[in-house]
Design a protein with these regions (language model features):
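A conserved alpha-helical element in kinase catalytic cores
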Residues: 65-84
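Conserved oxyanion/phosphate-binding beta-strand-loop segments in alpha/beta enzyme cores
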Residues: 5-11, 16-62
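Structural recognition of the beta-strand scaffold that forms the well-ordered cores
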Residues: 40-42, 59-62, 94, 103-107, ...
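A short glycine-rich, hydrophobically flanked beta-strand micro-motif that places a catalytic Asp/Glu
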Residues: 88-94, 228-235
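Middle-to-C-terminal accessory/interaction subdomains
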Residues: 34, 166-229, 237-238, 243-251, ...
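A short, hydrophobic C-terminal helix/tail in secreted or cell-surface proteins
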Residues: 367-371
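Internal "kinase-insert"/substrate-recognition segments embedded within catalytic cores
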Residues: 47-48, 62, 83-88, 100-217, ...
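Regulatory N- and C-terminal appendages and interdomain linkers associated
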Residues: 1-15, 357-366
């Protein structure tokens, strides 16, 4: 369910934007059950928040499971810095509702398609031709999501029982092309999935290798607990040569990453990592791997072992990731990859006042703090 609302965006200089809120709705799966709730917000007109590009639809992330409140923003910004397509921009905000302070949140571009949306080169109607018939080929946005639920999500079950939610075009039963779109997405994802399971396959026939390599490296660096399980997005569209392929992006949902997933400690010890907060050791390559056959149905695991991806990843890591990480760590004085990627000290300064108020003014702490 959703509600309309009046709202005010107040910048750091006290300037007020009173653009009305068309819809505000609870979001998230497990996160909705937490004390600090996340939301999706749709404004009646385009707004800019903290210098972000103007848009109508935003996700208000609670980051309740992350005591630092910053893992999502750091990895989103890193993804943007290394050239991952459709990296979501975001800002730290203080959220009030009905006069009550709810905490420090991360206001981020919502994963949507459309001319003014995050995925701005496809839209919900691209699957239909001029006569209203389903095209032979068409772009779509999908998410690998093990938590997809019948009756709530528009999804298909693919090889190995993998659930793939169709985010765009997002259709309801009875809509034109409802079943045709499901069959098309299943066919294309299965072909990609089967190719990814073979380390020596020509994955470039099915996917954009560079974006898949970056998606893997973001998850690998972050030791993302949900890697390949949920919130794994792919955009299926034409490349520069006109061939339809899967692009690994947008990146999403990293509050249980960078040493924050208590549940990963046992797994990491099996991989030779004694302390799950360490950055050393492989993660994605072992995630969901079957002990007897060493095979995996986890898409990020399979991508990480593909020969083409590994070859591309070497250059991407040293030419794009390493300069960004060195700048973040304060090892280099400047960085040309992005104007919105910062040093660890700068990230702290961006968040410190809002973060301090989050914990000083509220009675709840995160699950991680409770444990």
């Amino acid at each position: 369910n959703y509600s309309s609302a009046t709202g005010a965006i107040v910048d750091r200089n006290g300037k007020i934007d009173n653009t009305s809120i068309k819809k505000i709705k609870g979001r998230g799966n497990s996160t909705w059950g937490k004390a600090k709730k996340p939301y999706n917000i749709t404004y009646s007109d385009k707004v800019s928040i903290g210098g972000m590009s103007k848009g109508k639809k935003f996700s208000l992330l609670a980051n309740y499971q992350d005591d630092s409140l910053t893992r999502n923003r750091f990895l989103y910004d890193l993804a943007d810095a290394v050239g991952t397509p459709y990296a979501s921009d975001s800002r730290y905000v203080d959220f009030y509702s009905d006069g009550y302070y709810w905490g420090s949140y991360q206001m981020t571009e919502k994963i949507e398609v459309g001319k003014s949306a995050l995925v701005n080169d496809i839209d919900d109607t691209a699957y239909l031709d001029a006569d209203g018939n389903v095209n032979k080929n068409f772009p779509f946005l999908c998410e690998v999501d093990s938590g997809a639920v019948d009756g709530e999500d528009y999804y298909v079950k693919c090889d190995d029982g993998i659930k793939v939610t169709i985010k765009a075009p997002e259709l309801s039963e009875g809509d034109k092309g409802y079943n045709e779109v499901k069959n098309y997405v299943r066919e294309k994802y299965n072909a990609f999935h089967r190719a990814a399971k073979k380390a020596d396959s020509d994955l470039s026939q099915y996917a954009d290798v560079d974006s898949c390599a970056k998606l893997w490296l973001i998850n690998e660096l972050g030791k993302n607990w949900d890697s390949g399980v949920s919130s794994v997005y792919f955009v299926y569209k034409q490349d520069s040569d006109g061939n339809y392929k899967f692009f690994g992006s947008p990146v999403w949902d990293y509050d249980n990453a960078l040493g924050n997933a208590t549940g990963s400690a046992w797994d990491l010890q099996n991989f030779g990592v004694k302390d799950y907060t360490q950055y050393s050791g492989w993660w994605c390559r072992f995630k969901d791997r079957q002990k007897r056959t060493q095979n995996s149905s986890n898409i990020i695991n399979n991508i990480s072992r593909n020969t083409q991806v590994n070859k591309a990843a070497v250059n991407i890591w040293f030419e794009q990731f390493v300069p960004a990480i060195n700048y973040f760590a304060g090892k280099t004085a400047s960085y040309k990859g992005s104007d919105e990627f910062y040093t660890k000290t700068q990230y702290f300064d961006l968040l410190k006042d809002s973060g301090a108020m989050n914990y000083n003014c509220l009675l709840y702490t995160s699950d991680a703090a409770d444990e």
